[in-house]
Structures are given as C-alpha cells and as structure tokens.
C-alpha cells in the first residue's frame, strides 16, 4: 500500500496539471473497490484547480465556467494503485481510468490510474451535494480530523 510519502509525491507530481482542462475521460474498467461513476466523462471541459492530500486520499478539485458547482475526484490508491502521466502512450492492462488534460498550447497529457489489485477508488463528488451523496467526504475523511 502506498505510504504517506508516496501519496505526497504523487500529489506533487500532479501539480503541473493545475490549470489544465480535461478533454477526454475513458473508464476502461469501472470495477474498483467502489464502482466508478458511469458519468465520469462529465468532467470534460472542467479545469483542475487544486490538488490536496488528506492522509492517503487525494482530492482533485475541478471548476467549469458554465457550471457553478465545484466537482472533486476523491482518489485512494489502495494497495497497488498509482497515478501516472503519459504523452502518447497506450494504456496498459491495469490502467482503469484515463483522463486527458490539455494545456493552453494544446499539448495533451494523459493521467493513467493504474491498479492491478483494484483495491483503490475514484469517487466523483459534486461539492454542493456532499450531504446527499452516499460516498461523501464525511464518510471517508471525517475520522481523520
């Protein structure tokens, strides 16, 4: 299982994606610890605005100019998960989610969520609806203080 230093290193490696726009989302294998939302491709057009770490959870905040609600991906890497950035690389066997980001020059970077054991999770949270959603921050993060 990735320890805190690895999760923090992952967070820091993702920071160059802040300010970039999601251009494509591909869920290749939706079954992880919790099923990945079928409408995760709704992130297309959103801009990554902030990345946070709470214990071993990563929180990626997204904003869209035409949608006032902030959306967050809550990610846990599980025992064998990783987030890796690639340019023009085909997905590997255990790459479950691919998210394409475009910078202001149109350069595409693909974020691969790789998890051979499938113990990790990716939850899509709409921040206005935290209380009404069964998989909320509170459920996973409240005990962290």
Tell where the protein language model's regions lie, with residue ranges:
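Phosphate/anion-contacting hairpin/loop surfaces
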Residues: 68-145
